[in-house]
């Protein structure tokens, strides 16, 4: 099973890539994290946010792995703890389907994309830069895996 992170945005600062890579290289081969960057749509003065999100939705859908479980990151999603994420991971592995985590652009994710997702998940009640969410998600996936392995990385 692969964990895919589909994120709207490109040309991230080096420190984002460094942080993201730090956690992805720690993951075991059977839970590899793969990042797919989606080029954001141009915002112009006459273009509405719903038009931008719809165009980005098409790009995300084209990049989605077939039959993947879709977890859309959204401020109105379920507010899971790290332990809940760790509890879900073994079931996802047994299911055998890849998991695709979706990170929207500046305007968020298109409502149609959220509606077809298997789950809406909130990363934080705080407003975070989208680039930072990549690093936080990679760290939390690594932490969840270490919990399932009784690895000392996670301390209570």
Swiss-Prot record:
State the gene name recorded for this protein.
rlmH
Which InterPro entries does the record match to this protein? Alpha/beta_knot_MTases (IPR029028), RlmH-like (IPR003742), tRNA_m1G_MTases_N (IPR029026)
Q: Which GO terms describe its cellular component?
A: cytoplasm
**What organism is the protein native to?**
Paraburkholderia phytofirmans (strain DSM 17436 / LMG 22146 / PsJN)
- Which PANTHER family is this protein grouped with? METHYLTRANSFERASE, RIBOSOMAL RNA LARGE SUBUNIT METHYLTRANSFERASE H
Return the protein name.
Ribosomal RNA large subunit methyltransferase H
Catalysed reaction(s) here are: pseudouridine(1915) in 23S rRNA + S-adenosyl-L-methionine = N(3)-methylpseudouridine(1915) in 23S rRNA + S-adenosyl-L-homocysteine + H(+)
Compartments where located: Cytoplasm
Say which family it is in: Belongs to the RNA methyltransferase RlmH family.
The UniProt keywords, alphabetically, are:
Cytoplasm, Methyltransferase, rRNA processing, S-adenosyl-L-methionine, Transferase
Gene Ontology terms, MF aspect: rRNA (pseudouridine-N3-)-methyltransferase activity
So what EC number does this one have?
A: 2.1.1.177
Annotated function: Specifically methylates the pseudouridine at position 1915 (m3Psi1915) in 23S rRNA.
> Where along the chain is S-adenosyl-L-methionine bound?
73, 104, 123-128
Taxonomic superkingdom:
Bacteria
Give the record's subunit note: Homodimer.
**Which coarse location class describes where this protein primarily resides?**
cytoplasm
